[in-house]
């Protein structure tokens, strides 16, 4: 594990000692090498995963998320270059350092074997993200968005800390491997049910579940491109990862208390998908689509079957790459027309035809077109939900249709139609942007061709 962690930490001195002309090239190139080295973590040798030391542990659930975290760091650096072009050198270096600290926290969160260490790293991701949103956001509303993000996350996380400390006093350890081997299940009682709610509410806020989602559109819309990418691609997945870890340990209570969460998530998917249909702001539309997709992951994580866990993992990885790519495309539009309003960007297909191709691919991946991994994940969740309750197929079917509608609405509104003449002169698309889109799309296609890379032994 240290082969990933130590080089990532060493990117900080590399950034500060780099000369002006190398300040982007050095960290980006080295972080890309780290991401390639992290691909070895996708090798799954055993059922239970493997423990690197008493502190680090990895299995077929945390491995793909770790690799996704490492893969996105160089992409965030590539995407942010234009946004920070006019900033002084020291501020560029501070920005890169904040990204690297965030990356380190994420790696340690996904690989921690102790639940208290996981909690500390889960909270540690909050500070760099808050700095990125409130310091490098575009509008003045970024301070309000940061406040929402801070208070929602902190309020949700406090019950989790209390619950973990109580669990530790009862069991004597919070080591994941020891807890998995613990033969004594939790008794079905009111205090234990409250304990379950306390454990899961922090992750429901992070996902976010419908009703606790108000911070997400604000944070996404006001964050700079790197902030939007890391929020959509990795930070939301911390919630899904936490639910899947905690609910296994609190059996058999989950099977008795998950009904309101599943019903609210299924209903929330329909509601947020419908909200997407009437959005005019491009980033806001992508943010609400994230809430809709994460509702599906919550449903899958609470089902507790092998198939639903497989679907949740596939959906998290697929959504991480797809939504990050959509935010990058929205950013390329914003850098040219200086507006997030979709109707003002119409007709861009005539001027930037290759960028329109990336828009088409990203939109099709978002609506889960065969044979993408998005479809595999959604099918796995739909099958396991149908076996849980036949009525769920109505809501899941409606959600699939609405997702296709808003994805095509986003594509047609922003790319087709009559070109607006107020957009002259328009900058051409750059090689940097095409490389960025390729690095999102290639992993998605490779995983779609061979899902065993991320699903491991469960597939």
Curated annotation (Swiss-Prot):
GO-annotated molecular function: NADH dehydrogenase (ubiquinone) activity; ubiquinone binding
Major subcellular location class: mitochondrion
Keyword annotations from UniProtKB, A to Z: Electron transport, Membrane, Mitochondrion, Mitochondrion inner membrane, NAD, Respiratory chain, Translocase, Transmembrane, Transmembrane helix, Transport, Ubiquinone
Keyword Membrane (UniProt): yes
PANTHER family: NADH-UBIQUINONE OXIDOREDUCTASE CHAIN 4
Family as reported in the entry's similarity comment: Belongs to the complex I subunit 4 family.
Protein name per Swiss-Prot or TrEMBL: NADH-ubiquinone oxidoreductase chain 4
Organism per entry: Osphranter robustus
Organism taxonomic ancestry: Eukaryota, Metazoa, Chordata, Craniata, Vertebrata
Recorded name of the encoding gene: MT-ND4
């Amino acid at each position: 594990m240290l082969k990933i962690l130590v080089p990532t930490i060493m990117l900080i001195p590399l950034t500060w000692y780099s000369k002006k002309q190398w300040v982007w090239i050095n960290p980006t190139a080295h972080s890309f090498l780290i991401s390639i080295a992290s691909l070895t973590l996708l090798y799954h040798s055993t059922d239970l995963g493997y423990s690197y030391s008493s502190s680090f542990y990895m299995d077929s659930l945390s491995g793909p998320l770790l690799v996704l975290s490492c893969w996105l760091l160089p992409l965030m650096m590539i995407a942010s270059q234009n946004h920070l072009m006019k900033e002084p050198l020291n501020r560029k270096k501070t920005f890169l350092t904040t990204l690297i600290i965030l990356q380190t926290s994420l790696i340690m969160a996904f690989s921690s074997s102790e639940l208290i260490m996981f909690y500390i790293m889960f909270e540690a991701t909050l500070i760099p993200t808050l700095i990125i949103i409130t310091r490098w956001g575009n509008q003045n509303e970024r301070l309000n968005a940061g406040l929402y993000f801070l208070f929602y996350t902190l309020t949700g996380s406090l019950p989790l800390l209390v619950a973990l400390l109580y669990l530790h006093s009862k069991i004597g350890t919070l080591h994941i491997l020891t807890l998995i081997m613990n033969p004594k299940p939790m008794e079905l009682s009111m205090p234990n049910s409250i304990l379950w709610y306390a454990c899961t509410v922090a992750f429901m806020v992070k996902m976010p579940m419908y009703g606790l989602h108000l911070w997400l559109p604000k944070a996404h819309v006001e964050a700079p491109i790197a902030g939007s990418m890391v929020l959509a691609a990795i930070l939301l997945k911390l919630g899904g990862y936490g639910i899947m870890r905690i609910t296994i340990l609190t059996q058999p209570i989950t099977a008795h208390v998950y009904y309101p969460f599943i019903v609210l998530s299924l209903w929330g998917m329909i509601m947020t998908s419908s909200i997407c249909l009437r959005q005019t702001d491009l980033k806001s539309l992508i943010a609400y689509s994230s809430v809709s997709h994460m509702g599906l992951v919550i449903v899958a994580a609470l089902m507790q079957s092998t198939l639903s866990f497989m679907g949740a993992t596939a959906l998290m990885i697929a959504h991480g790459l797809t939504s990050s790519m959509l935010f990058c495309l929205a950013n390329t539009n914003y850098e040219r027309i200086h507006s997030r309003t979709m109707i003002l960007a119409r007709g861009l297909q005539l001027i930037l035809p290759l960028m329109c191709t990336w828009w088409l691919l990203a939109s099709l991946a978002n609506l889960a077109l065969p044979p993408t991994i998005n479809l595999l994940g959604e099918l796995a969740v739909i099958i396991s939900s149908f076996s849980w309750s036949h009525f769920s197929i109505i809501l899941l079917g409606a959600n699939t249709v609405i997702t296709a509608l808003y994805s095509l609405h986003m594509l047609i509104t922003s790319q087709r139609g009559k070109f607006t003449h107020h957009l002259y002169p328009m900058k051409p698309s750059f090689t940097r942007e095409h490389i960025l889109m390729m690095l999102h799309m290639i992993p998605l296609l490779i995983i779609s061709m061979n899902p065993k890379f991320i699903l491991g032994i469960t597939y």
